């Protein structure tokens, strides 16, 4: 036995962020950490794995791992999409780091040519990082969680954890003698026990080094009332609002705590559809009235709900929403009906004009449009694009996305949409040779016949939009990141401070060297 200075955390979770420089901390790691702390476990979250080199990694482990460290977990959610066993396939990133972005970030943070943790995982070279964990405690388990575990099946983990983790991770820690399968997925929806979702909130510690201008993630509801054909979110079709929406008290506590401790006022609401319930919006509006500050929110909404519930437009403004992303998807009547958004396109457009009158310059409206849906031809898309480009169009930013179909048989732990489970029914074909994300063909009454074609159209339209940027007085939330109080370079601003605090807080622990 030897004496070692360490914090001896029960768990360590390694996390990444969305694209730099306008990053958002991965929320899931901090949600799980909060849940475990509430149940008596000590947890360290390490953010910014895209900027973490292996030398700093070992320095952190030296003062963090001890005899009581049960697991070191890695979140795959913001790692790049890749082939299951390597980086052979160029795959649309959908907001996560693509391979070039990973390398650019490494260069920007000046890691002297060393692979960062995220890049090592992407290249299938994570073993040295895991070996260092085992060096300091051979009994510590390695877990891989997050939404992309199927894309990182070669990661040297003892266990892979699928889906929402609150129930599964607590079971894992509380049942140490249980023989756990490599894949832990016995409650991937975190619904088998009443663990307190509606009373829950996510909190942060001094080690997280939160800055006041950060955009934080806020869960108000977990689930959605609707079941759109293309939607792969796991908890759709929820009807009982009392079971999937947080209580006012917990929402108030989280917002006030983050403001009091860190000065946080800006949030991205993670709800699948924020305005799926007017009752929910009224509840949030009442919470906001009680706060000693005015929060600002970005969220995803359905515009057809504002057609049937026009009072929602004012409610969203009262809450403090300053940016909405509207899932328009298509204006083609047959296509819209197939995917579950069959309201007449003119009614949806009029609703967008309606909210513009109420919101004025205070809310920026962004929209998403999917290329490759059933029945919609290129000419139909061009007609919609022409409307988006009109000077008085109430949609300030439109983003085109190719339809991506992920075959369930290839990625069994990824939540799948109805379209992905029965794509043949809708005229899509995926051959064995092309059985990876996105490689479909189709033969229907449209002239868009493949993913490759839909991707090319989306890229061309997005480029066209960039060449004609809409300059307006409408709220633009994008300050240049140099003007914001956020961590801009984790290698100089985050990791040195983290190490200093960990070394200062370390206590002498007896460690068995055998």
PLM regions: where:
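Radical SAM enzyme core and accessory elements
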Residues: 1-13, 37-38, 42, 64-70, ...
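Radical SAM [4Fe-4S] cluster-binding motif and immediate context
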Residues: 196-364, 371, 386
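Short acidic/polar active-site loop segments enriched in Thr and Asp
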Residues: 70, 264-265, 322, 394-396
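A structural motif corresponding to the C-terminal end of an alpha-helix
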Residues: 39-41, 129-140, 261-262, 291, ...
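Flexible glycine/acidic-rich beta-alpha junction loops that bind and position SAM and/or redox cofactors
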Residues: 20, 78-86, 148-153, 279, ...
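Short, electropositive alpha-helical surface patch
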Residues: 156, 163, 282-289, 376-395
């Amino acid at each position: 036995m030897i004496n070692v200075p360490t914090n001896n955390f029960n768990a360590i979770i390694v996390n990444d962020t969305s694209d730099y420089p306008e990053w958002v901390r991965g929320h899931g790691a901090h949600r799980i950490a909060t849940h475990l702390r509430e149940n008596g476990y000590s947890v360290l979250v390490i953010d910014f794995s895209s900027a973490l080199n292996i030398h700093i990694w070992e320095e952190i482990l030296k003062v963090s791992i001890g005899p009581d460290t049960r697991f070191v977990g890695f979140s795959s959610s913001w790692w790049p999409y890749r082939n299951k066993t390597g980086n052979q396939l160029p795959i649309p990133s959908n907001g996560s780091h693509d391979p070039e972005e990973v390398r650019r970030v490494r260069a920007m943070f000046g890691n002297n040519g060393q692979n960062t943790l995220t890049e090592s995982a992407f290249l299938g070279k994570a073993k040295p990082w895991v070996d260092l964990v085992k060096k300091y405690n051979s009994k510590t388990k390695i877990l891989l969680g997050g939404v992309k575990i199927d894309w990182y099946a070669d990661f040297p983990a003892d266990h892979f954890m699928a889906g929402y983790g609150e129930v599964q991770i607590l079971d894992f820690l509380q049942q140490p003698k249980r023989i756990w399968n490599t894949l832990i997925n016995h409650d991937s929806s975190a619904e088998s026990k009443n663990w307190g979702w509606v009373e829950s909130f996510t909190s942060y510690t001094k080690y997280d080094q939160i800055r006041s201008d950060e955009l934080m993630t806020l869960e108000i509801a977990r689930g959605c009332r609707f079941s759109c054909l293309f939607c792969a979110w796991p908890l759709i079709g929820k009807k009982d609002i009392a079971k999937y929406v947080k209580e006012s008290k917990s929402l108030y506590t989280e917002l006030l705590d983050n403001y009091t401790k860190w000065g946080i006022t800006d949030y991205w609401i993670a709800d699948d559809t924020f305005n799926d319930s007017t009752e929910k919006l009224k509840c949030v509006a009442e919470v906001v009235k009680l706060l000693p500050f005015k929060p600002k929110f970005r969220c995803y909404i359905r515009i057809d709900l504002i057609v049937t519930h026009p009072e929602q437009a004012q409610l969203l403004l009262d809450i403090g929403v300053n940016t909405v992303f509207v899932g328009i998807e298509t204006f083609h009547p047959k296509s819209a009906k197939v995917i579950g958004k069959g309201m007449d396109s003119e009614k949806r457009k009029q609703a967008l004009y309606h909210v513009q009158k109420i919101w004025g310059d205070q809310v920026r409206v962004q929209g998403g449009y999917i290329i490759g849906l059933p029945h919609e031809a290129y000419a139909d898309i061009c007609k919609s694009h022409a409307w988006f480009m009109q000077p008085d169009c109430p949609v300030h930013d439109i983003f085109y996305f190719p339809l991506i179909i992920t075959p369930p048989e290839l990625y069994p732990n990824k939540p799948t949409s109805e379209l992905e489970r029965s794509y043949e029914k809708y005229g899509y074909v995926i051959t064995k040779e092309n059985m990876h994300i996105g490689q479909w063909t189709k033969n229907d009454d449209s002239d868009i016949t493949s993913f490759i074609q839909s991707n090319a159209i989306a890229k061309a339209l997005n480029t066209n939009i960039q060449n004609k940027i809409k300059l307006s007085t409408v709220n633009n939330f994008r300050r240049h990141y140099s003007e914001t109080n956020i961590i801009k370079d984790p290698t100089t601003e985050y990791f040195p401070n983290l190490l200093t605090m960990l070394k200062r807080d370390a206590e002498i622990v007896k460690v068995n060297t055998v």
